[in-house]
Every structure is written in structure tokens, then in C-alpha cells.
Amino acid sequence: GYILQQSRNFATEALNPHAATLRMRGRPKVMLARTYEEAMQLYERYKDNCLGVISDVRFPMHGARDSEAGFKLLEDIRKQDEYVPLIMESSETANKYRADREHFHFVDKNSKMLSVELRHLIEEHMGFGDFVFRDPHTHKEIARVSTLKQLQDNIFKIPSDSMLYHISRNHISRWLCARAIFPVSK
């Protein structure tokens, strides 16, 4: 629901009805994999346009249920792309420590705020919220933009070290891709 609603909102930024239709066609898709092998196959196929990966900890790998499959999946994806957002979901809080150690975001499936926490991570790390330019040293907010027009109006006001920080980590490309603005994002 949330991703589809955001895609509809982004389409309204288009200049004309044709551009809005193109944006809706290019909107982000949620892909579901039931095994490690399916997940890696989907990642390999779509990695150039992947906004992020959300994984459970336990699921089948090599034909058997594997209690480490989620960590193995995210570790293997991280080897290919050090900046793609990776979110681990688990009902076992002990997995949070390992997720933190591996630099994966973590969501506790037992949390009463699960949907809010997941939505926040998707907004902040997968390009669906405002784009927040940060100081690369302090991580303090420098500027915030909600639309492509605001980005255009503010881009030359952003300090070069902040711009380089975000560009080198594909943050801006991810934000543009979430809005189906592919030619600019590349």
C-alpha cells in the first residue's frame, strides 16, 4: 500500500499526463522470493534497479530450511553492492546484534510499531521520503527536498563534500529511481 501510494504521489510531479503515465509504468515493484536461490536470481536480474532488500532470517536454502539464510543472502548482496539498503526482519531480538554488526538495518517483527518502523526505513533508505542532504562528517541535515523541482532549485547550494558523499553512495540515484526518473538517475 505505502509504496504504491508514494508512486502515485510521485507521478503527480510529472509535467504532463504522458509523463505521469510513464512514471506509473516505471514505478518500483515489490518482488517476493521464497528461497535463497529465488532471492539471488531476482537480485541478479534487477540489481541495477534495486532500491533495497528486505529479508527474513529463516527460509529455505539448497532445499532445506536454513536458520542463517537471511544473513547469507544479505551478506552475498552486500559483496556486490556495498551501499544498497538491506533490512533484516526477525522476531528474535538476538538477531539485532548480528544485523547491527553486519551493518544491516533491523526490524523486530514483534514490535507494536513494526509497520511504522519499516515504513521509516523504506522512506529514509530506499528513496521514498524526502531527500536529506547530510554533512558527511557529522551526518547533520544540511538541506531537505521533497520534489524534483526542489532538488533543481537547491542543487547548487549543497556543499560539494555532501554532494560527493551522496552521489558516491548512489543515494541520489536511488531517490530518483524511486520516482521513476531513470534517465537522470543514471
List PLM regions with ranges.
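Alpha4 helix (beta4-alpha4-beta5 surface) of REC/receiver domains from two-component response regulators
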Residues: 5, 20, 64-68, 72, ...
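Well-ordered alpha-helical segments embedded in enzymatic catalytic cores
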Residues: 35-38, 72-73, 171
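Long, compositionally biased intrinsically disordered regulatory segments in eukaryotic proteins
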Residues: 89-186
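Acidic, metal-coordinating helix/loop segments flanking the phosphotransfer/catalytic sites
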Residues: 7-52, 62
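Short, solvent-exposed beta-strand-terminating loops
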Residues: 1-3
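Active-site T/S-Asp motif of two-component receiver
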Residues: 53-57
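Surface-exposed alpha-helical segments enriched in charged/polar residues
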Residues: 41-44, 75, 79, 123
